[in-house]
Amino acid sequence: MGKYMRKFRGATGEELAAMEVTQVVGVRTRSRSAAAAGATTTKVQAASAASTRRRKALLPTAVVGTTRRDGGSCYLQLRSRMLFMAPPRPAPAARAPVVAEAAGSGNGAAAHAAAGLSRCSSTASSVDAAAQDRSLACRSDVAEAGSEHVPEGSASDSASGRDRERRETTPSSFLPGEVSDLESDLAGGQKRSRPLPSAATASAQQATRPKIPPAAEIEAFFAAAEEAEAKRFAAKYNFDVVRGVPLDAGRFEWTPVVSSRS
């Protein structure tokens, strides 16, 4: 930038005051100003056109034309674009056969499941019955083996008891609910048949009990301790605590004390 002073002289020779001219870098000329104004006008027109189109799009669109396809779908020709419309949903009546078919298939599956469960239950019951028969047979064999150890004097009674027990322990003679009673009876018999403690067991129990020495032994022990303590006191203080009299030889001289009452 620079400042220039220009002076002009008039025809009469008068000196006119010059005006200060300030030149700024980047000052637009007339042509540049006209071009900038034209560009601004173009931008304003484009913005107004875009806003007009936006307002038209926001307004309720009017259908210009429709084109329907075979599948039920159609295109709506709007003012600015073409809109696709999906076909309408089928009526609920068309779904009823499908639902009925699904229900029928579900019932069939439930029936198959029930049949499978019945087969499984029957198989399980047969397996349980077989296992119960085997367990009862084993119990009867054990009972027979236990009854063989009975003395000869009671052979007739044990034979009748074995026959009765064999008849009672057959699988077909009682219901499954009676098995628990039989087991409880066998357990009670085993508890009752436990042997009594022997003499060796009793002696071992006696040996483990704490021993209390007799009164005479306790008295002798304390008497010896008292005698030793009396000897130690007599040797140190020349006084016999057992008889209550002083000794002649010693470091101390004992003098009897007379009470004031006497």
Swiss-Prot record:
Keywords: Protein kinase inhibitor. InterPro entries: CDI_dom, CDI_dom_sf, KRP. One of its GO terms (biological process) is regulation of cell cycle. It comes from the Eukaryota. Residues 198-208 have a biased composition (Low complexity). Residues 160-169 have a biased composition (Basic and acidic residues). This is Cyclin-dependent kinase inhibitor 1.
